[in-house]
């Protein structure tokens, strides 16, 4: 009887761009040999809106409402880096109270970012129940944002050159302390529910490994880098805002797999609560914005130095000119290094506004992580990277 010969050839399938686990409009062209992934090509650009060009045709004050749409899970970080770039270039100091308020907002947004990552990631790997718990906790953070800024998820429009738009409202500090007391036991609950679950551990342990050297060579940052054993956090490295005033640690893992990335983010939420508590306890008095910013920029002979204006809050002018020069400024967002390369030419509009999003670099490593893995691991590995396509495509 003749032997039947089975011929197999690679098959190319498209995952996305409209797929429930693609974390935005991302398309993956995956080459398969049976269940094994041979190659993967991410196709991006579906959410490109020309944010850099928009920035070059807006004043800094006008552009702040736009920026929370890059990474719409972490709008405060986008606002922070947007005002930090002109501040550093113009040499505008930020009052201590404003810096503390900024840190509180950034750390709340870091927790919200990690929660928004954790819920869908667990749903991707088959755990549906924690998804609803996590969104419950996120609501409390958005309530705090709403009380301070008037908006919840995005478009907070809260950060300003030289400070913040408004002081914290009456009772806000107490409400934030209550959230910290409420949230830490919930993180313990997540750990009991998820971290010690043998099915979850077997699903992620050893999957999507990346070594320390590879992580550095690929230009990874944030939890992706720290999960591979590199203790690199811009809050410690660049000493921006007032993070040096607080006692906190940089969570690190050495395994470099999906489970390590999960553990690093869980520990980061604990550290963020620690920072928020210290900032609330040490919140100084004084102005919440630099009232001298306008006088400093206009110079000694400005009318703003006159007697008539000495009792008026000298807020930053809407026609603030970005000084001539260039500067790269970065912050540690929930996903990694978020940077702005700014070139000013003594005009109200920037000459160049280059955005360096963290998840764009982190997404580049995906084809390497997927090679040799199973189809079922694609979603788990992609979810562990934490990408937001608004930030990747800009």
UniProtKB/Swiss-Prot annotation:
Q: What is the lineage of its organism?
A: Bacteria, Bacillati, Cyanobacteriota, Cyanophyceae, Acaryochloridales
Record's catalysed reaction(s): a plastoquinone + NADH + (n+1) H(+)(in) = a plastoquinol + NAD(+) + n H(+)(out); a plastoquinone + NADPH + (n+1) H(+)(in) = a plastoquinol + NADP(+) + n H(+)(out)
Superkingdom of this entry's organism?
A: Bacteria
Q: Which organism is it from?
A: Thermosynechococcus vestitus (strain NIES-2133 / IAM M-273 / BP-1)
- The entry's protein name is NAD(P)H-quinone oxidoreductase subunit H
What's the EC number here? 7.1.1.-
Q: Which Gene Ontology BP terms does the record give?
A: photosynthesis, light reaction
Membrane topology, record value: Peripheral membrane protein
- NCBIfam families documented for this protein: NuoD, PRK06075.1, PRK07415.1
Q: How does it assemble?
A: NDH-1 can be composed of about 15 different subunits; different subcomplexes with different compositions have been identified which probably have different functions.
